[in-house]
Amino acid sequence: MNRLRVARLTPLELLLSLMSLLLGTRPHGSPGPLQCYSVGPLGILNCSWEPLGDLETPPVLYHQSQKYHPNRVWEVKVPSKQSWVTIPREQFTMADKLLIWGTQKGRPLWSSVSVNLETQMKPDTPQIFSQVDISEEATLEATVQWAPPVWPPQKVLICQFRYKECQAETWTRLEPQLKTDGLTPVEMQNLEPGTCYQVSGRCQVENGYPWGEWSSPLSFQTPFLDPEDVWVSGTVCETSGKRAALLVWKDPRPCVQVTYTVWFGAGDITTTQEEVPCCKSPVPAWMEWAVVSPGNSTSWVPPTNLSLVCLAPESAPCDVGVSSADGSPGIKVTWKQGTRKPLEYVVDWAQDGDSLDKLNWTRLPPGNLSTLLPGEFKGGVPYRITVTAVYSGGLAAAPSVWGFREELVPLAGPAVWRLPDDPPGTPVVAWGEVPRHQLRGQATHYTFCIQSRGLSTVCRNVSSQTQTATLPNLHLGSFKLWVTVSTVAGQGPPGPNLSLHLPDNRIRWKALPWFLSLWGLLLMGCGLSLASTRCLQARCLHWRHKLLPQWIWERVPDPANSNSGQPYIKEVSLPQPPKDGPILEVEEVELQPVVESPKASAPIYSGYEKHFLPTPEELGLLV
């Protein structure tokens, strides 16, 4: 609590003090280090000054009535390190004139100031009502009602208002200033949707008098508007079964968290997705239209009905070209109109490898057939660019192309492999494409090189549309082959080597006649042997029995149990004695005379036959 004390002075001391003060008195309202004003017609008196050099020794403030009590001087103790003090209302009289000065260690600090309590006062803060009317027409406008501070009704105050975004630091003051006799509402125009704002005000008595303090800010938020720029990312018109499309839209206020409701439809079928975060939603298969609206919207009117119907290819733009713009960080895109004029064109682009939601796009009127894509593009990085014609009944997109802000030298070469020879003995090779992020430009041509031991390297350029090569007229031996790719910036490094080996086929052809002759002789010998087998089989069989032991020519030879050492005895079947036959009638016939045959000459035996011929007894022919 401030310490107030009334100082009693003698008439002579008071006169000297008043004279010294009057000589150094500054008129009221003039700027100076000491500022004093009252707050409201019945408020306190507030004095402030610039910070002093000696903060440890507190100053002392004095004020003296100039109108009602000229002989009374009040002393106010100021706490240390404080550059302001408040004088309660009971220490001065309303509509009085005060003389105020200060000292520190008995020395005067500033020239004394004269304060007229009738005029030199700050009004209290105006009252701002929480009801805010927002108009959603061409632009967002907010209207705020307010009431003036407590003040004599016969006097008019001048009030000023300001507003700002909740997260901003700089205020925007509204013009013109308002007076309390009309109470015109406060209007704020060109507000952003879905944004938090604050508004406050202050008042003053007249121009030249001090302004009152700013009122506590009133916070309000503008409604979320339906997104106007809705587009589709991906292959919405893909028919090969790899359809992957994503509905995307631009966030009107990136710093404000809001969820959306998305509608998809096809004929009489409607699909709703609620609580969808900003700013993407997968597109179900076979949908024909899409609508996006903020989740907190009380009424739904289709704001942007994006058609997803795919039109005929001839309606799409054609001859899409991409080039780098000289002296600009963007990429220039050109195209030609299809068979009919669209409502607008949409050019979208994305960096190679980015997901579907990382898509940028721009809309162009139907008369534009070229554009310079905005943004910062990196050199050597491929960007997929698509130009789409938008019609009332659907979309027609041109095939995507790849563009570069600046083409660089490739970082790698293509891999090469061997195909079946065509014709036999003539190698055929093929190579693949270099990945786009390593190609770093548009391929102008390929170069394949062949190197053999002892010979110089031979290289040949082929078109960038060619990925196979036939290698005729190669001499016999081993080779190494590799392929490089070039852009407008230069030739890249070689790819992996492919080893080739061509054997000498002439040796094989020289040996073929001898090989065929050998086979002919072999076949001839086999034929003759088969023909003579039947003739020699009987004789060979006889001599085999006579000359070879039995255990050799037996079907299953068994030398241990063989009887080859025993005399050869052939078992023959003996004739059976005749049996009595049936009694038959006998007819006598006349016998013919028997003619004796000439005697055969007796066999001549040399004695050698006994070694291997069986005797008649052995044969069982004699009894």
Swiss-Prot record:
Disulfide bonds: none annotated. This is Interleukin-27 receptor subunit alpha. Keywords: Glycoprotein, Membrane, Receptor, Repeat, Signal, Transmembrane, Transmembrane helix. Induction: Down-regulated on differentiation of CD4+ T-cells in both Th1 and TH2 cells. Glycans are attached at residues 46, 296, 305, 360, 368, 461. The gene is Il27ra. Its main location: membrane. The chain crosses the membrane at residues 511-531. Receptor for IL27. Requires IL6ST/GP130 to mediate signal transduction in response to IL27. This signaling system acts through STAT3 and STAT1. Involved in the regulation of Th1-type immune responses. Also appears to be involved in innate defense mechanisms. One of its GO terms (biological process) is defense response to Gram-positive bacterium. Belongs to the type I cytokine receptor family. Type 2 subfamily. It is a single-pass type I membrane protein. One of its GO terms (cellular component) is cytoplasm. Expressed in CD4+ and CD8+ T-cells, B-cells, natural killer cells and macrophages. Highest levels in CD4+ T-cells and natural killer cells. Expression highest in Th0 cells. A motif (WSXWS motif) lies at residues 211-215. It is found in: Membrane. Residues 532-623 are cytoplasmic.
